[in-house]
Design a protein with these regions (language model features):
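Charge-dense, helix-prone N-terminal extensions
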Residues: 1-131
Length: 131
């Protein structure tokens, strides 16, 4: 899929071990497949973010895994149970992917699409207030 890659995101990914590069590149592709209008940026000096009408997700490589932070993940259904952390956080959730683990791309794409839809509807604060 063709998209405008932020060279700072490329630099971040290129500096990682091969197995983390592969994970980050796959998550990046999934984010752009979720909606062609998703853009990339870097926040907090080095952390890659995917945004569309608000934050959608961010990447952070750790020693033995890659974290995918889902913004407003607290109101996104997770029927396949791919979220691994953040259940005590009011809004964000996290998926940790370790070397050799398969990414559930269809489930992650659906989550990205739901977060984007929520962003377009005004974000989690507006959606929670309406409940």
């Amino acid at each position: 899929m063709a998209y405008a890659a932020d060279p700072r995101v490329d630099e971040y990914i290129d500096a990682l071990p091969d197995w983390q590069q592969a994970i980050c590149r796959q998550v990046r592709e999934i984010a752009h497949e979720a909606d062609p209008e998703v853009t990339e940026t870097v926040k907090r000096r080095v952390q890659p973010y995917f945004v569309l009408d608000g934050n959608v997700a961010a990447l952070l490589a750790a020693k033995d895994h890659v974290n995918v932070f889902l913004y407003d993940g607290a109101i996104v259904p997770d029927p396949e149970g791919i979220m691994t952390r953040g259940h005590d956080n009011t809004t964000a959730r996290q998926i940790s992917i370790r070397q050799g683990e398969r990414i559930n791309a269809p489930a992650l794409k659906r989550m990205f699409q739901q977060i984007i839809a929520n962003n377009r509807a005004g974000g989690w604060r507006k959606l929670k207030a309406a409940r």
